[in-house]
Every structure is written in C-alpha cells, then in structure tokens.
C-alpha cells in the first residue's frame, strides 16, 4: 500500500507544480527521484541516469527536430501575414460567430492528415489567436479549442487516423487503423457535439460578463499592421502542402530506403543502421514541414525578411522549452512505471471483471499516471493484452472493439495538468494552467465520457 501512495504522491506533486506554474523541467526529476528515494535510496543515481535521462534524451533525439520545424513554420505563418489573411477570409465567409468551429476543423484536418499534435499546436496558434482576437473570444479558450480539434477525436476515435494512439493497438490485437469504424464514428460525434456545445457556452458566458479577448497577454502573434496580406488561397497553401506531403512521404520513405538503411561514411568506424519503419512518421513530418517552410519563405519573403532573425530566435526558444517540458514528462513516466507501486496498481486494475471497462479504466489510469496517452496504453497493453483478448473471446467481443476502446481511453486522463502536450500547448499560447487548464479538463471529461458511451453503445446494439 505504501508503494502505491509513494507513486501517487509523486504524481500529485508534479501536477500541483505544473498547475501553479513551476517548471516541469525542474519538478519532473524531483518528483520522480523523490519517489525512488522513498522506495530504494540506493537506486536514485542509477534511476536518474539509466531511466529518467535515458528516456528524456531519447525523446529529444527523436522529436526535437519536429518541435523546431513546427515552431519555425508557425512563426513564419505569423510573420508573413498568412494567418491574418486566412482569418480575414474565414470571417468574410463564415462570420465571426463560427470562429471556434473553424479552428476545431483546421486542427482536425491536420491531425487526421497525419500531422503531429505538437506541430498542429504550433501551426494553428497564429490563426486561432488572430481569429479569436477579431471575434472578441477570450484567448483562454484557445487551448481547449485546439485540444478538441487535435487531442481528442482525430487522435484516437476517428477510424483510420494515423496518430500513434490509433496504431499501437494494432500490434496487440491484430487489427488495423480502421478497427470498429461505427463505434469510432459514434464516439467522434459524441466528442464533437458536446465539445462544441461546451466551448460555445463558455463563449456566451464570457460575452454576458463583457469579457473580450484579453489584455496584457504573452506570446501574441506579431503580424505587422502595415503589410499587404496575400490571397487566402496562397496563405492556406502551406498548411495543405504540409498535410499532403506528410501523407505522401509516409508512403514514399519506406520505398526509398527499404526496411532498414546503413549509413557508411569514411569517418565512421562502423555503419549506422536505421530501422526505417520506426522513424518513417518522424522523417515524413520533418520533410513536410521543411517543404512548408520553403513555400512560406518563397511566397511571403517580402513581409518576413525584416523580422526573420528575431522571429527565428523566438521560434527556436519556444521549441526548446516545449521539447524539454515534454521530454521531462517522458522521463518522469518511465521512472514511475518502474516503481513497485505502479505494478501494484496495474494488478489491481486487472481485477475489474468487465473486459471493456477493465481495459478502458486500466489504459486511462496508466496514461494519467505516466502523463502520456501512448506511454500509458503501451504499458497497459504490454502487461494485460493477453488477458483482455481471452476475456473478449469468452464474452464474444470482437477484437476490433478492444482496439477502439483502448485507443479512445488513452486520450482520457492523459491530459492531466502534468501531461507534456498540455504543457506544450499552454507554453505555445502563452497561458498558464490557472488561466486555461479548466477548458482542457472539460474536454478531457467529455472525452472520457465518450469511451463509456461507446462501450454502452456496443453492449446495447452490438454495432462495431
């Protein structure tokens, strides 16, 4: 019992620190190693070097280029006036009252096209900030709006989504990304409808109080007022290019390099072997972002050139902060998952009798503890997938349903205050947990209820 309390105390400390605005880069190792100290004092050093730093550095190695290119792309979209051009067109066509659905739609299209959640946050923020400012919608609702579009139904519920949360279950259940399509569509509609209703209700309440976009805000878009705005079709072209090329490169890269690639250079003592399958998605989004950056520079250089040096420095600083925040969370999750309290908790969750509820609760709780949807789901399925499969066969539950429930459950409690994506999104928007986390939490609750709704729908109708 004490081991469980230690693990949960570390989690509570990190969540409290994140909510109060303390640096997660500092408090993630403090919380993780504090738990190790209380469990086995002699293991603190090895746990820090061999677990925390190993996972943290591994995350940076894989994903920092994505953070960097995403931040630069978003900054150029902002400086070029592309974001303001698209916002002006959206207001002309749809009116200011549809600002929230427009941002949700843009985020959804990008994530369903395979663009990383982190990249979407960087790329969409300039549009969202400009549109919300002109529409008089509080800036504090931007993170929840982006979360609804990028961190919810297109992440793991919508059939066919290429996001990793929808791919992980395939290796455990022998399914594919289109598993349980009707349940996925039903869950997606549940999230979209109730998410938009909640956001619009918050907007109306803010209007009634006379609350506008806000003042004295940080990380505001810096598009100068004296530039000529490009045509909206030119402005939206880089976003479409990134989404399209990301999809194409995902298919092309394995064809170019094969299953693995050996790098041989005169100065190397031995060849560097890369397993292409594991890195394809990352290379694809990097190539797509580079192409998008080049297109923005070509089409908008006249507006960008005077602010390129300053803007690029700001983008690099933002990318470093966002990547290190998320990497620290990754290290924290690795340490906590190795503690005896975590194993006790995992075994306790396995005792839940209903197979779908067992899977949903196990995945979402472990995702919440580790602060990672993919991490929590991987741990849960690695430990319990055989049990889930046996129980599903005994209850005549198709494995496709297990896939969809696991994927959707991973995106529930993973958005607690210490989650890396949440911290990154707040850092990009220049908002604190106190200002904006309430909205993200509301989307989290809706997302969690959607999983229960999908389970109930299956049991009542048998639809898959």
Q: What are the language-model segments listed below?
A:
Residues 97-110, 137-154, 180-185, 189, ...:
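Alpha-helical transmembrane segments of multi-pass membrane proteins
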Residues 7, 39, 182-311, 428-429, ...:
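Long, contiguous bundles of hydrophobic transmembrane helices that form the permeation core
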Residues 6-18, 29-38, 67-72, 106-111, ...:
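Hydrophobic core segments of alpha-helical transmembrane domains in multi-pass membrane transport
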Residues 90, 94, 425-446:
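Interfacial loop-to-transmembrane junctions
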Residues 64-70, 93-130, 323-331, 352-390:
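Hydrophobic alpha-helical transmembrane segments of multi-pass integral membrane proteins
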Residues 71, 85-87, 119-131, 160-172, ...:
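Re-entrant/interfacial helical elements at transmembrane boundaries that shape
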């Amino acid at each position: 019992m004490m081991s469980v309390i230690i693990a949960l105390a570390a989690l509570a400390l990190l969540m409290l620190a994140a909510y109060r605005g303390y640096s997660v880069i500092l408090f993630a190792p403090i919380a993780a190693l504090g738990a190790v100290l209380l469990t086995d004092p002699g293991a603190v050093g090895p746990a820090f070097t061999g677990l925390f730093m190993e996972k943290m550095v591994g995350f940076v190695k894989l994903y920092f280029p994505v953070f960097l290119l995403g931040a630069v792309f978003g900054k150029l979209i902002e400086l070029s006036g592309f974001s303001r051009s698209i916002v002006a067109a959206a207001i002309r066509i749809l009116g200011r009252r549809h600002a929230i659905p427009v941002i949700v739609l843009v985020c959804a299209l990008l994530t369903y096209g395979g663009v990383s959640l982190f990249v979407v946050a960087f790329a969409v923020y300039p549009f969202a900030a400009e549109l919300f400012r002109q529409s008089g919608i509080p800036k504090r609702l931007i993170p929840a709006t982006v979360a609804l579009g990028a961190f919810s139904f297109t992440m793991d519920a919508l059939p066919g989504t290429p996001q990793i949360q929808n791919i992980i279950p395939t290796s455990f259940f022998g399914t594919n990304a289109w598993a349980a399509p009707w349940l996925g569509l039903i869950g997606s509609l549940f999230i979209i409808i109730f998410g938009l209703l909640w956001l619009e209700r918050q907007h109306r309440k803010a209007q009634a109080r006379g609350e506008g976009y806000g003042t004295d805000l940080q990380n505001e878009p810096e598009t100068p007022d004296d530039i000529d705005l490009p045509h909206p079709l030119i402005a939206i072209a880089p976003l479409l290019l990134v989404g399209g090329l990301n999809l194409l490169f995902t298919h092309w890269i394995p064809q170019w390099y094969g299953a693995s690639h050996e790098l041989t250079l005169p100065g190397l003592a031995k060849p560097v072997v890369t397993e292409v399958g594991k890195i394809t998605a990352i290379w694809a989004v990097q190539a797509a972002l580079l192409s998008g950056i080049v297109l923005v520079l070509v089409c908008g250089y006249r507006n960008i050139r005077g602010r390129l040096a300053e803007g690029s420095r700001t983008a690099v600083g933002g990318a470093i902060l966002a990547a290190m925040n998320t990497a620290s969370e990754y290290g924290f999750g690795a340490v906590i998952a190795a503690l005896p309290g975590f194993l006790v908790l995992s075994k306790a969750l396995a005792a839940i009798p209903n197979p779908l509820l067992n899977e949903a609760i196990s995945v979402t709780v472990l995702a919440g503890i580790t602060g990672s949807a993919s991490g929590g789901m991987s741990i849960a399925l690695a430990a319990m997938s055989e049990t889930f499969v046996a129980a599903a066969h005994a209850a005549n539950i198709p494995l496709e349903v297990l896939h969809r429930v696991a994927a959707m459950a991973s995106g529930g409690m993973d958005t607690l205050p210490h989650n890396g994506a949440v911290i990154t999104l707040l850092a990009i928007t220049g908002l604190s947990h106190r200002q904006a986390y309430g909205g993200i939490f509301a989307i989290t609750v809706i997302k969690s209820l959607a999983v229960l709704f999908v389970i109930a729908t299956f049991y009542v109708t048998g639809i898959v």
